[in-house]
A protein has these predicted regions:
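Structured, basic alpha/beta domains of bacterial-type, RNA-associated proteins
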Residues: 2-11, 19, 23-141
């Protein structure tokens, strides 16, 4: 029986789930909106919100804890046909994303269902995005 078992296995090993969670959240912080399946989005949502709460504190211990929980990968931007490093995921989290939500007590992400389904397994696709970054675009449409 499956009583009191938290989390989703997503048909992966524990190390694969951890790597997938880190990669999805890193991509979310880098691009601020990503397309994924509904179970993956629901699984990583709490992890992303926990990291944003750490970024709101902004102290050294919170930064070190966020680095331990998340891969501190570089963010690249294409300039003149070559990729140039413009920062890191943790740097963006603590300098841009954390201060953006200082007056918000929680609920930093939103899940929007997409009308199309994934080709192959017919999985429900969703947009996982940070709240506040596309509010102007949504209100204009």
């Amino acid at each position: 029986m499956r009583h009191r078992v938290a989390g989703r296995h997503l048909n992966r090993t524990s190390s694969h789930r951890l790597a997938m969670r880190r990669n999805i959240v890193s991509s979310l912080f880098e691009h601020e909106t990503i397309s994924t399946t509904m179970p993956k989005a629901k699984e990583v949502r709490g992890f992303a919100e926990k990291l944003i709460t750490l970024a709101k504190k902004g102290d050294l211990a919170s930064r070190r804890r966020a680095i331990a929980l998340l891969n501190n990968r570089a963010i690249y931007k294409e300039e003149n046909g070559s990729n140039v490093q413009v920062g890191t995921v943790i740097g963006k989290l603590f300098s841009e994303i954390g201060p953006r939500y200082l007056d918000r007590p929680g609920g930093y992400t939103r899940i929007i269902r997409l009308p199309k389904r994934r080709l192959g397994d017919n999985g429900q696709l969703v947009l996982l995005q940070l709240v506040g970054q596309d509010d102007k675009k949504l209100s204009n449409k």
